[in-house]
Amino acid sequence: MEKELTFYSAGLKLAGTLYLPGNLQPGDERPTVLCCHGLRANRKVILPEFARAFAKQGYVAFVFDYRGFGDSEGTKWRLISKERDEDIINATTFLGLQPEVDADRIVLFGISYGGANVISAGATDPRTKAVASIVGFGDGDRWARNSRRLWEYWALRKRIEKDRERRVLTGSSEYVDAYEILIPTPAEEKFYSGSGQIASLKSELPLETAEDIMSYKPEAVVHQIAPRPLLLIGAELDYLTGFEECVSLYEKAREPKQLHILPGISHYETYSQGFDTVMRLSLNLFGQALGAR
């Protein structure tokens, strides 16, 4: 069963979908997985398959659109990382008010950029009982630098500086094609074309977002998740964020922590070929953190 819901974050109405297990009985309160989407995605891309799989295992799962994305209110396609963290924290509060949710057993599950967001939000919010970060990153500037040739990186830096001047003079940021910030890979085009979801991902992003991404460093706070358990999953052939980002996060995190690099697959194949492994590892983590359902 699925329920469409809305809640507010910073005065903006955000849209979400609640996935309920089939064996839910009146009065039941279940452990809940809050699922967080990637950079330019929305709640209808990739995550519904994971949410339904969690529900089949007896969990409640919730997927929502960050402000400015999907069906949520906010400046369209404007991504500010700390605002996304705030949306996650407010979603946690909202979930705790739902009759089907055990407010004391909420965990975070994030993919790609959402994998970075769940680390910083989980580190900030002690209500989070466990964090699963899938093909995320720890340092936005390092990611931006490593995904470009050096001259391209510095050219982007120069554009960002000019845009900062523009914003203080005009109050607006220049919007550019998302692929000028998020360098595309052949694996991405193949995955989304095959899934039929490519149209829903067409977007432009403000250069303000590029500046924000490059200043975002979840690895600076990842140690604060402990003593709650952390799961980091990377992909050996991840040419988008690079599995080294997961390794760096792992090195800076404290126990209890797990790191798994899935062999022979790309960033996007983590959601298809790697799906069963991601689910198995995540369910093991959540089961240990939350106890029997």
Protein language model regions, located:
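N-terminal cap/lid segment of alpha/beta-hydrolase-fold proteins
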Residues: M1-D28
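The serine-hydrolase catalytic nucleophile loop
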Residues: L39-R52, Y66
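Catalytic nucleophile-loop/oxyanion-hole region of alpha/beta-hydrolase
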Residues: N42-I46, F69-V107, Y271-G274, V278
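Conserved alpha/beta-hydrolase
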Residues: A53-D71
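Alpha/beta-hydrolase-fold enzymes
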Residues: N117-S195
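Short beta-strand/loop motif that positions the catalytic acidic residue
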Residues: I225-A226, L232-G234
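Conserved alpha/beta-hydrolase "acid-adjacent" motif
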Residues: Y239-E245
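Catalytic active-site module of serine/aspartate enzymes centered on a nucleophile-bearing elbow/loop
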Residues: I265-Y268, S272-R293
